[in-house]
């Protein structure tokens, strides 16, 4: 089984589509469906189950996530360049990523993490 976090976002849904194209439907998707576009991104995609991000994180932290996971593709982060809530960024981007990476390392599961240009800013400072 493959886990894709942020699966209903633009890039995550493209990853899910590609996994489907190569025959992978054993995908557990994770996201927070907080706007009308995200469910549309999942239309016609194949996956075995959906977890809300908070529920998924609770599963990971409590040791309930199946060890049948072969890979976590982690796209679940806030990439907004205008949001200024430091606590939210820390919990959603840093702590969430750290928890998943530690679980993957402990369970010998491949962990793929991708970032965006939002990490680096608009280039005004070099």
Predicted feature residues:
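NAD(P)H-binding glycine-rich loop region in Rossmannoid oxidoreductase-like domains
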Residues: 44, 53-54, 58-92, 121-122
């Amino acid at each position: 089984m493959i886990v894709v976090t942020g699966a209903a976002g633009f890039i995550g849904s493209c990853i899910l589509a590609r996994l489907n194209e190569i025959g992978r439907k054993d995908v557990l998707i994770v996201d927070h469906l907080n706007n009308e576009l995200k469910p549309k991104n999942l239309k016609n995609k194949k996956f075995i189950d959906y977890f809300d991000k908070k529920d998924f994180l609770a599963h990971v932290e409590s040791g309930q996530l199946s060890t049948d996971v072969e890979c976590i593709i982690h796209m679940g982060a806030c990439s907004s360049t205008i949001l200024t809530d430091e606590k939210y960024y820390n919990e959603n981007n840093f702590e969430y990523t750290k928890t998943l990476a530690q679980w993957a390392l402990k369970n010998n599961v491949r962990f793929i993490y991708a970032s965006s240009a939002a990490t680096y800013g608009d280039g005004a400072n070099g």
